[in-house]
From Swiss-Prot:
Keywords: GTP-binding, Nucleotide-binding, Repeat, Ribosome biogenesis. PANTHER family: GTPASE DER (PTHR43834:SF6). GTPase that plays an essential role in the late steps of ribosome biogenesis. This is GTPase Der. Pfam families: KH_dom-like (PF14714), MMR_HSR1 (PF01926). One of its GO terms (biological process) is ribosome biogenesis.
């Protein structure tokens, strides 16, 4: 590793990853360059936050979950109705209320006809129990509590997670009377809400903030003690169970040729390379629903659960088959979640020279977004190259936790901008003035510029950051703040 960068071993400061002296010096520089101090503080706070607590929105179909999710995140994302046959690629979003950020999980994409309403809602609750720090349980106040609702209440109560009860579709006084009947569920005060019109959502979100911890229960890093957490993810039948068996040294996971037949075990503590690791269970992506309809959504929901609990995602890909859209979705999910990433290509021992040639071409085109991820070619069946897995995981975690000191970063940016200035656009040439790495896990940079920085130039900066400082195995987030003329606001 480069001698002027270091992994972050401790929790981040109140100024993101900047120490007090570093922060004071940086703010002085920002003031000299004419930036609004509040904007700069906000940018560092936004990029420098630690892991976000997770809030799951759970409820049976047609109670307004998706409408509520859209209301909370402040924009319309995807479908609003719970319709059979409608699924989403994405299930997690970042949200903010009263200055606090959290991750929001929309469980509304589950198709209600797959296993019947009871089983589908139970699957959502299962996710919430597994990965969320708090739960919003949405009930239709007009209909009242159903048997399905009662069943979910039992699951939630058993899990012991904080629950905020949302009585939706309350549009007036009569609706509030309907909502009051939901006290009988035993989950505390029902919050009367109209997700469609926004009525009551603010009060409900205030209650959510009281229920959510400041940081997630699955807090990152070795500082809290315990083994590092690995999510082994990938589409059904790529060999995840076989790989887990091989590294664990025993058949602790039931394996079948039918995709997704693994039963639900708990997280596995496994010793590899003299170190104990916690393999976060991904049974959901392997547990087939025995019906094609809805299985993909169920898989993505459970994969999201595993990724949320982990620090590094080992993405298993079947090297004997073409890289699929589903493989790419799983990769995107891990990147969007900001986890360290290792690519493991399974069934390598079955490939002939022609397939290896075409696989390399596929990797170059289909997995371009993770060209920075360490790669291992393995055989879960024979155990080939299993010893390469741990060094790849350690490399990815190392990159994920690396921080470049502000002084070193600005020296690098100064040299880069002088040698490769931004293209002139409309007679103007925007310049990057200075920047800082406000956070780690993954590395998050805030750059301050004199004008809008094009995406192509941002990609160039990321590429050069990787060349200079490593960051192997981790996504990098770069946000740019523009110095506006007096009287104008940022961006």
């Amino acid at each position: 590793m480069n001698d002027h960068i270091q992994p972050e071993g401790s929790a981040e400061h109140e100024h993101g990853a900047l120490g007090d002296a570093e922060y004071a010096e940086f703010m002085e520089l920002a003031a000299e360059e004419g930036f609004d101090i509040e904007d700069v503080e906000g940018a560092i706070d936004e990029a420098g936050h630690g892991p976000l607590p997770v809030l799951a929105v759970v409820g049976r179909p047609n109670v307004g979950k998706s409408t509520l999710v859209n209301r909370i995140i402040g924009r319309r994302e995807a479908v609003v109705e719970d319709k059979p046959g409608v699924t989403r690629d994405r299930v997690t979003y970042e949200a903010e209320w009263a200055g606090r950020r959290f991750k929001l999980v929309d469980t509304g994409g589950w198709e209600q006809d797959v296993l019947g309403i009871d089983a589908s809602v139970a699957a959502q609750a299962e996710y919430a129990i597994e990965a969320a720090d708090a739960v919003v349980f949405v009930v239709d106040a007009k209909v009242g509590a159903t048997d399905t609702d009662e069943a979910v209440v039992r699951l939630l109560r058993k899990a012991g997670k904080p629950v905020v009860l949302c009585a939706n579709k309350v549009d007036g006084q009569s609706g509030e009377a309907d909502a009051s009947y939901l006290w009988a569920l035993g989950l505390g005060e029902p919050h009367p809400v109209s997700a469609l019109h926004g009525r009551g959502t603010g009060d409900m979100l205030d209650a959510v903030l009281e229920a959510l911890p400041e940081a997630p229960a699955q807090s990152f890093g070795a500082a809290i003690g315990g083994p590092r957490r690995i999510a082994l993810i990938g589409r059904p039948n790529v060999g995840k169970s076989s790989l887990l068996n091989k590294v664990a040294g025993e058949d602790r996971v039931v394996v079948n040729e039918i995709a997704g037949t693994t039963r639900d075990p708990v997280d596995e503590l496994i010793e590899l390379g003299g170190v104990t690791w916690k393999f976060v269970d991904t049974a959901g992506i392997r547990k087939r629903v025995h019906l094609q309809q809805g299985a993909d959504y169920y898989a993505s929901l459970r994969t999201a659960a595993a990724v949320e609990k982990a620090e590094v995602a080992v993405i298993l890909i079947d090297a004997s088959e073409s890289i699929s859209v589903q493989d790419q979705r799983i990769v995107t999910m891990a990147v969007d979640a900001g986890r360290a990433i290792v690519l493991a290509f399974n069934k390598w021992d079955t490939l002939d020279e022609e397939r290896r040639y075409y696989l390399e071409r596929e990797i170059e085109t289909e997995l371009l977004q993770v060209a920075w991820a360490p790669r291992v070619n393995v055989s879960a069946r024979t155990g080939r190259h299993m010893e390469k897995l741990v060094p790849a995981i350690e490399t990815a975690l190392d990159g994920w936790e690396t921080r470049v000191p502000t002084g070193r970063l600005n020296a690098f940016l100064g040299e880069l901008v002088a040698a490769h200035p931004h293209p002139v656009r409309g007679g103007k040439q925007p310049r990057i003035l200075f920047g800082t790495q406000a956070g780690t896990k993954p590395p998050r940079f805030v750059l301050f510029a004199s004008g809008f920085i094009e995406h192509g130039y941002r990609r160039f900066i990321e590429r050069r950051l990787r060349e200079e400082f490593g960051f192997e195995g981790t996504p990098i987030h770069i946000s740019v703040r523009v110095r506006e003329k007096r009287g104008n606001k940022k961006k």
